[in-house]
Structures are given as structure tokens and as C-alpha cells.
Amino acid sequence: SVWSVYPGSVLLYPNAASGNNNITWNFQGSGYLWLPPLMEDPLDSEVVYIAGGGINGGNHLIKLTKVGNSIVPQELSYPFNNTVTSMAYSPIDPSHWYVMTYNGTFYHSTDYGESWTMTSGFSGPESHYFYGSTIHPSNQDLGKVVIGGSGYSNDPVFISYNHGQSFQSFSDGLPNTMVFEIDGTLTDQVLFAATQLGPYAYVEGEDEWINIMGFSAPDQTYWSLEYVPEIHTARFGTYGRGIWDFIVDENIDVSYGDVNNDNTINIQDIILLVNIILYDLEYTISGDINNDNSINVIDIVMLSDIILERFSK
């Protein structure tokens, strides 16, 4: 199924692959953005959340549930201080939810949105007046969150390493511009940003954003962005010039050291490396820690160092 938002309504296509029949829910109440963001429920495929506004006034998250051939709304109780402009949850631990409001206020929840804590002493980038702002929780480090929005009189991007308790600027290399969306590779090695002035990328270790438009991509507003890991591609949506793909290295999402692909690097991965060497098993790129196209005792030593370093933090 596919959920989508349109000015004034939310549409659900229950069988998008086989037809265009849809179910519609018209906005109730007031205070919504022109194109308010949607967020899927991390546990229930029949549920999404829309940013309010509110059905009964105020500014809330509104839960939308598919029930038969209709969409049933439920206004969640927490009152945010302004129109909600961005929502996200951690892909590592989906009980951690994040919200930004129109004036740049940031909120964090540890219980799937039941209760919220507002970041004090911080005013983040404000929202676009009808499209919203952006939150990108890390795919690798719980608590690491990158946010973006209006950057004409302040920095457009900030980063937190503690679920938003504190933020620091993360805008080196970016011009004064509006950042509409941020997404990144599964390993966090590269972040991408869709902005008013074009597409940008931040490579881990380079410590600045770079313009990746090149000579062929359109000089236009880049409204939307999604990183598609299956094809190692950052997919940008532009204003009037269609969809443009930025293809990265096919090994960009390899988590070196995670030999058994369980998203955790530990002693089990060392055991697998030993077995690969002893029994001449098939080469796996995630076990080739030093990228010399072979797996040997050096990779075991390097993997041991990685594990010891993580335990020492």
C-alpha cells in the first residue's frame, strides 16, 4: 500500500501495484501546512501520522488508521508549541520519536510519542512556509540526529549526538539556503541534502558539504530526496525538471566487520573470519577490513581492534 498527501487531504492506495483505487481522508480542523509530512507507524503498516494542526485546535500529531475502506483519525494529546513541520523515528530503536515545529523547536519522545521533552535553550532552523523541515536520525548511532530547514539568517543544518538534548552547527560548505530534506546511506558514510540551491553531499571524514550538481543536473530547486539502498542511489525530486539520481559506489553500504550482517560487530564476526581463513570459505567484502581483496589474520587483528575500541567508549 502507498500513503500520500495532497493539499487538504491524505490518500491511501491499498493495492498500488495493481490499481489506482484509493481511500481519502480530508483534513479536519485547522493549522496544517499546505503539504504536511506523513510518518509511517514503525510497528503497524495500517497506520500513519500526519503533522498538525489539530482536529480540535492546537498543534498535534494525528494518527490515521485504515479501517476497512475508510481512514479513521485520532488526535494525539500532546500539544506542541507551533505547527508540526517534521517527524521521524530512530531506525535503530523505533521507540525514539522526534518532532520539529514551525519555529525550529525540537522535541524527543522515548515511548513511541506518548510523552515528549522539548529541547531547552535551542532554536533550530525554521520551516518552509508550506513544505516543512527535515529530521534524519542516524542509521548507525542511536541518539545521533541531523535536522535541517531555513538557513537564510542562521545555519541551515544542525547535529545532535544525544537525542536532541543539545545541538551544534553542521553547515560547513552549505550556502545560506533552505534545506528541504536530508537522507543518508545505511552506514552513515554519506549524507545527502535537497536544497533550494541544489543537491549536496556530506562525506564522513571530509567535514563539509559539497555541491554534487556537476554539469548535467538541472540548476533548480531540489524539493525531495530519498536514498535507495538497493541501487546505491540518492534520488532527488526537482521543481519542474523531474527526478534525478545520484549513484554512489556499490560498496557504500557495506558495514566492514559485520560479517554475519546482524547489524552488530562482536565476537561472532571474529569467529566467522577465523572459519573463512581455516576452511577457505567464500570471500565476503564485509570481512575484508583493510580492503586488500583477501581475508587473512590482518583482518582479524583489525576487527579485534574495532571491537575493543567500541567497548572502551
List the predicted regions and their residue ranges.
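Beta-propeller blade termini and top-face loops
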Residues: S1-E250
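Cellulosome-associated attachment modules in secreted, modular CAZymes
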Residues: E250-K313
